[in-house]
Swiss-Prot record:
Key words of the record: Cytoplasm, DNA-binding, Repressor, Transcription, Transcription regulation, Virulence
Cited InterPro entries: MogR_DNA-bd, MogR_DNA-bd_sf
Pfam families: MogR_DNAbind
Protein name listed in UniProt: Motility gene repressor MogR
Subcellular location: Cytoplasm
Name of the coding gene: mogR
Length: 306
């Protein structure tokens, strides 16, 4: 079954859920039967989608649900699994299914294609269970117990002992606890002190040079990273724009394919009709033909230039 048939079925299911009527299930079963899909499967998706939308309303509507602390509802995951299964059975690719179900196309789920695809694979690999899944909360920082006895610290944040012990080597003079690096002022003060200590010792010029060279290299890397991050963000934005454009072109292609198919059928019906039927049907045929040609972008004003 072509991708367009699966899309039409899911589109009809969403339409019936958005505008329920007494014959909703009947219409869905009829379309499923004509498309060669199990009617029970189509009806199950209809009921799952109905329950999902009801659950969203219970959370205050789609906007509040999208900004709530819930990442996925249990019924939403059941619907996700059912939609992927029905499409995969008809040889659709996971990437195309994700695009079709997402906010970019049918909008069955208030999710992006990547969110749908990642969650489907997690369900398939049983990395997550079919249950309500909350959004990840940022970790809380643990409170550190303050020392009741105030102790003196040096510029590196290291506690100065009561009995001062003179350092025996240059290494001892510049060593400090990295875990106590607090802010930019502490770091710059530490660098300044290290340079002064190294400069006071004869024969340590090379060490000072190496230290400053290392600082320069690290700062250069930081600048390069900043530029790369910006380029990466620009590429991401461009990629999203291309994805949207690609989705639009796919939809346009499907529409033109359907219109071309209609045009062929109209011409064939007229060509193979009897002479009498052709004479009687000519006015209606001409009108239908013009409408279909317009859908394909062919108009009276431009057809000679094509």
């Amino acid at each position: 079954m072509p991708k367009s048939e699966i899309r039409k079925l899911l589109q009809e299911i969403k339409k019936q859920v958005d505008n329920p009527g007494n014959s909703s299930t009947t219409e869905i079963k009829k379309m499923a039967s004509e498309a060669g899909i199990d009617e029970k499967t189509a009806e199950e998706i209809y009921h799952l989608l109905t329950e999902f939308y009801q659950a969203v309303e219970e959370h205050g509507g789609i906007e509040k649900y999208m900004h709530s602390n819930i990442s996925w509802l249990k019924i939403e995951l059941e619907l996700l699994s059912a939609c992927y299964q029905i499409a995969i059975l008809e040889d659709m690719k996971v990437l195309d299914i994700s695009e079709m179900l997402s906010l970019n196309d049918l909008r069955i789920f208030p999710k992006t294609p990547s969110q749908l695809q990642n969650t489907y694979y997690k369900l398939k690999k049983e990395l997550i269970q079919v249950e309500d899944i909350p959004k990840n909360k940022p970790g809380r920082k643990r409170k550190t117990q303050k020392n009741t006895k105030k102790e003196k610290t040096n510029i590196f944040g290291k506690v100065v002992p009561a009995e001062f012990k003179a350092p025996t080597s240059i290494k001892e003079q510049i060593s400090y606890d990295k875990s106590r690096e607090k802010n930019l002022v502490d770091l710059l003060s530490g660098v300044k002190s290290n340079v002064q200590l190294l400069s006071e010792n004869q024969g340590e010029e090379n060490n000072v040079y190496d230290l400053l060279k290392s600082i320069y290299s690290l700062s250069s890397l930081a600048v390069q990273k900043e530029e790369l991050d910006k380029k990466y963000q620009d590429l991401q934005t461009k990629c999203q724009e291309l994805e949207q454009e690609n989705s639009y072109l796919k939809q346009q292609n499907e529409t033109m394919t359907d219109s071309f198919h209609t045009l062929v059928l109209q011409v064939a019906d007229f060509a193979y009709a009897s002479d009498l039927d052709q004479i009687q049907a000519l006015p209606l045929f001409s009108q239908q033909l013009v409408v279909t040609l317009n859908q394909l972008g062919v108009f009276k004003e431009n057809y000679k230039q094509m």
